[in-house]
């Protein structure tokens, strides 16, 4: 499965009603009241018929297809963890003392996608999108949010296109002679790691949980 699935501006799943706390009206207080929209598998984010990920379909054949499928699913998961939140919530550093936010993750992964191309595409490495401010500069306004979604989609597509020219996983690319296989595994690892961060960030914002 390719692409990122649902539009970042339209929630994949309509949020359920939650019981808020007096301190933070957007967050669930009792761990037993943590909520998910899933009813078929309560540990999931959404039910299968509303989940754009390839979680119940036939698994792909071949190593490259499997890696691409995992990458696509983790990309979608990141967007799902951001759905239904306003700009302030997306920029909220909800797990102090970390400076991470969901918006910061979108910006960071756009930067990482851009950096990966510098490993193997001939020419000068691409300049950084946000300097050193992918997390620190993640401001809670609509313009920054729209920019981050646009940047991420563009950089993902550019890296996908560049790597599509190298389907042999054993081929070594760039000055460092990195194997395509290593780069593909690293891409999956990067998104998987940050989806774990997104789990905690989202739960601390409004209590919503689920794979």
Tell where the protein language model's regions lie, with residue ranges.
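Conserved small-residue motifs centered on glycine
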Residues: 4
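Intrinsically disordered, low-complexity segments enriched in serine/proline and basic residues
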Residues: 7, 11, 16-19, 26-29
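Acidic/histidine-rich alpha-helical segments that form the ligand environment
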Residues: 134-171, 182-187
């Amino acid at each position: 499965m390719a692409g990122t699935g649902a539009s970042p501006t339209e929630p994949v799943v309509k949020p359920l009603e939650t019981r808020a706390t007096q301190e933070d009206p957007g967050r669930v207080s009792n761990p037993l009241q943590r909520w998910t929209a899933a009813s078929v598998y309560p540990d999931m984010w959404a039910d299968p018929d509303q989940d754009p990920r390839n979680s119940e379909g036939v698994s792909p054949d071949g190593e490259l297809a499997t890696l691409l499928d995992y990458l696509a699913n983790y990309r979608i998961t990141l967007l799902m963890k951001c759905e239904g939140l306003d700009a302030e919530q997306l920029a909220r550093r909800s797990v102090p003392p970390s400076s991470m936010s969901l918006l910061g993750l979108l910006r960071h992964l756009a930067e990482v996608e851009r950096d990966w191309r510098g490993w193997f595409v001939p020419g000068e490495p691409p300049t950084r999108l946000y300097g050193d401010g992918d997390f620190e500069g993640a401001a809670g306004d609509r313009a920054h949010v729209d920019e981050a979604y646009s940047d991420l989609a563009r950089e993902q597509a550019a890296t996908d296109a560049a790597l599509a020219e190298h389907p042999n996983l054993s081929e070594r690319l760039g000055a460092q002679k990195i194997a395509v296989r290593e780069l593909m595994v690293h891409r999956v690892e990067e998104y998987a790691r940050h989806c774990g961060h997104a789990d905690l960030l989202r739960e601390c914002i409004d209590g919503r949980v689920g794979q």
